[in-house]
Amino acid sequence: MNHEELINSLTKKMNGALQVLDADLKGLRVGQASAYFLDPVQVEAYNSKVPILQVATISVSDTKTILVQVWDKSLVKAVKKAIMEANLGVSIISDDNQIIRLQLPIPSEERRKELVKIAHKYQEKSKIIVRNIRRDGIELIKQMEQNTECSKDEAHIYSKEIQELTDKYCDKIDKIIKLKEQDIINL
């Protein structure tokens, strides 16, 4: 693997860390209803636990209401139970046959602080992923140097480049979390 391929590979992996962070943050409800909000819900259906998206269609009717249209009428109770057990802080306001309406309350000040803490945990998790990618990249540089694929000076330059890439992605993570934090606080 040459220097350019290594940097491209590390960049791709670090972008993956940002995508994981984005997916984690979509699960945090901050003011507006989102179809992603129910992603963590697992429903007991057909003798196994399945994601809610495999048994229902999820849509948003307004900023505070999520509609869950269950495909199989026999699973409506299981879906309601799974939503309640997921502790998402939602209220089931009605269920007309196979459509379940979920009302999202405005988070209290305490809940907002809790959401900020969760966002910071996601931030640290993402930074750890990025740092682990950096560590792996630097290990590869050391191997390249030992195998005389690059000189000591080149290895130093490549390591510095990897560190700069790491700093860039850590800054991106910080900016994403800062925006999310402002969204949470300004509800």
UniProtKB/Swiss-Prot annotation:
Transmembrane parts of this sequence: none
GO biological process: cytoplasmic translational termination
InterPro entries: Ribosome_recyc_fac (IPR002661), Ribosome_recyc_fac_dom (IPR023584), RRF_sf (IPR036191)
Coiled coil (UniProt feature): none
Entry-linked Pfam families: RRF
Keywords annotated in UniProt: Cytoplasm, Protein biosynthesis
Subcellular location: Cytoplasm
GO terms for cellular component: cytosol
MF term (GO), any: ribosomal large subunit binding
Keyword Membrane attributed: no
Role played: Responsible for the release of ribosomes from messenger RNA at the termination of protein biosynthesis. May increase the efficiency of translation by recycling ribosomes from one round of translation to another.
Family membership: Belongs to the RRF family.
Name assigned to this protein: Ribosome-recycling factor
